[in-house]
Design a protein with these regions (language model features):
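Trp/Phe/Arg-rich N-terminal binding region typifying the photolyase-homology
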Residues: 1-79
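Alpha-amylase-like alpha-glycosidases and glucanotransferases acting on alpha-linked glucans and related
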Residues: 9, 15, 53-186, 190, ...
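Aromatic/hydrophobic pocket-lining residues that form π-stacking "cages" and hydrophobic walls in ligand
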Residues: 29, 196, 346
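Surface-exposed amphipathic alpha-helices with a cationic face
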Residues: 34, 193-201, 326, 350-351
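Short acidic catalytic loops
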Residues: 38-45, 200, 206-212, 282-294
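Conserved, well-ordered alpha-helix/loop/beta-strand core segments that scaffold catalytic motifs
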Residues: 182-215
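Terminal-tail/helix-coil boundary detector
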Residues: 466, 471-491
Length: 491
């Protein structure tokens, strides 16, 4: 069945608290999607973020981001009582001020923990039994805060850094309240997420999640299971991820994420990946796998190299991993972010897995149309069509900044003149395409310019902060989307 959806992260929702959350605005947006005829809500990775606030550099592949917990919902559920005169952080219409939000939300979550933990203990204990990663993640987060937030390889106590048994016990006792607090936050996040997901699913809306292929160097994952990664005896990465030099970057890109020990994981029957994907399948109905090509072949760069030029391509786990995942998780629905260097091995793996790849309309008008896989005339059914993604400029921003030749190619093919009708033309392009799914960022639905861009790759600061203004998702907008969905048979 042909479907369509909106890409908008939870943090971008409007409302009190300074950041979007799993509160009433999330439910209202689900109502908007239902009215619009949209069957997909795509979000960015939901893990806890730190320096830079990138959802793609999370402290855990399993944990949820406590900043997305709705404190208003905690009050409504009787888990948080505010003092007279105490208020939520006021609504900020357009940008998330992360430091301010974190300070304020931490204060309210600590208060909810002290008021409510005791009454929730039976449920929390069951949560700990069901989600075995939580205990280590809570300890990791408590110790990290204890040492001022420095990355775990720089912790001054060698015992806890290397996870010696006596040190684990010592810190668990010493930081008991903080550990319990972080368990509480995870319990609340997943409780609110489950309620939210049930609401969306009951309206026929599938939650479309996002999963980075790699983990952050400074994460509970590398601290808890260092044997899974290419680390030396001091737990420093031996080699890191990235991509080679190309037309856009003479030095390539060095992402810095530690690489997997794929041979070791093969002998463990890929259990680490099975558990990771099992967690994703609980969170989401569909999972977009970022940098999917890394399963076919991945670029390996020596740790400490000045750039990515000295890296080399290495064969990835390929079909062996996905045979295991198919056996253990037969209902797992995956979309491959297959942007980047396409090789025969990548194409063969995509065919074996059978999952849709991606097409991005704003990538489609540079160079020769016949050789451009993103040119709309080259799209086919087993793809997800996007006007753009979180890493691109908005479509209005793209129209304003594209070079003359590229813009003329788009105007000639899509038949538009100005910015507003151009954005509309791109939206109609993806909705009318043969692709099985079509996804439009909310910024494009609202015809917003570059000021609403979510992320500018290669930059630090100012990213991930866009928020939709209250009242922007109007009935008129929903009605127009529904008319297009009906016209292009996506309802």
């Amino acid at each position: 069945m042909r479907k369509s959806g909106i890409l908008m992260h939870i943090s971008s929702l409007p409302g009190a608290g300074g950041i979007g959350s799993l509160g009433k605005e999330a439910y209202a947006f689900a109502d908007f999607l239902e009215t619009s005829g949209m069957k997909l809500w795509q979000v960015l990775p939901m893990g806890p973020t730190g320096y830079g606030e990138s959802p793609y550099q999370s402290f855990s592949v399993h944990a949820g981001n406590p900043m997305l917990i709705s404190t208003e919902k905690l009050v409504a559920d009787g888990l948080l009582t505010l003092d007279p005169g105490e208020e939520f952080m006021p609504t900020q219409d357009e940008r998330v001020e992360f430091d301010q939000v974190r300070e304020n939300k931490e204060k309210l979550l600590r208060k909810a923990f002290h008021q409510s933990e005791k009454g929730l203990l039976p449920e929390i204990r069951q949560f700990l039994r069901d989600e075995r990663w939580v205990s280590d993640f809570a300890l990791f987060t408590a110790v990290k805060q204890h040492f001022g937030g420095v990355m775990w390889r720089q912790w001054p106590d060698e015992g806890i850094k290397m996870r010696r048994k006596e040190s684990l016990l010592q810190y668990r006792m010493m930081l008991d309240e903080d550990v319990r607090y972080h368990v509480f936050c995870q319990f609340i996040f997943f409780r609110q997420w489950k309620e939210f997901k049930t609401y969306c699913n009951n309206k026929g809306i599938a939650l479309f999640g996002d999963m980075p292929i790699y983990v952050a160097e400074d994460s509970a994952d590398t601290w808890t299971q260092p044997e899974v990664f290419q680390l030396d005896k001091n737990r420093a990465p031996k080699r890191v991820a990235g991509v080679p030099p190309d037309y856009f970057s003479a030095d390539g890109q060095m992402w810095g994420n530690p690489l997997y020990r794929w041979t070791y994981l093969f002998f463990r029957r890929y259990d680490w990946w099975v558990e990771r994907m099992r967690g994703m399948s609980k969170l989401y109905d569909i999972v977009r796998v970022d940098h999917f090509i890394g399963f076919a072949n991945y670029y390996s760069i020596p740790y400490g190299a000045p750039n990515a030029r000295s890296g080399k391509w290495i064969v990835g786990p390929g079909k062996k991993l996905f045979r295991r995942l198919k056996k253990e998780l037969p209902n797992l629905r995956v979309v491959a972010e297959d942007l980047g260097v396409q090789s025969d091995r990548v194409r063969e793996l995509l065919k074996f897995v059978g999952c849709p790849g991606m097409k991005v309309a704003t990538f489609g008008f540079g160079g020769d149309a016949d050789g451009n896989q993103h040119f709309p005339g080259n799209w086919s059914e087993n793809y997800v069509a996007y006007t753009g993604t979180h890493d691109n400029d908005t479509t209005a921003g793209w129209i304003a900044t594209a070079d003359e030749t590229t813009l003329k190619a788009a105007k000639d093919y899509l038949h538009f003149d100005g910015t507003d009708d151009g954005v509309e033309a791109f939206i109609r392009c993806v909705l009318s395409s043969p692709c099985c799914m079509a996804v439009v960022p909310m910024q494009d639905v609202l015809h917003l310019g570059s000021e609403a861009r979510m992320n500018l790759p290669g930059t630090i600061g100012g990213n991930w902060a866009w928020r939709m203004k209250p009242g922007a998702a109007t009935e008129d907008v929903a009605r127009h989307l529904r008319e297009m969905n009906q016209e292009y048979q996506r309802i």
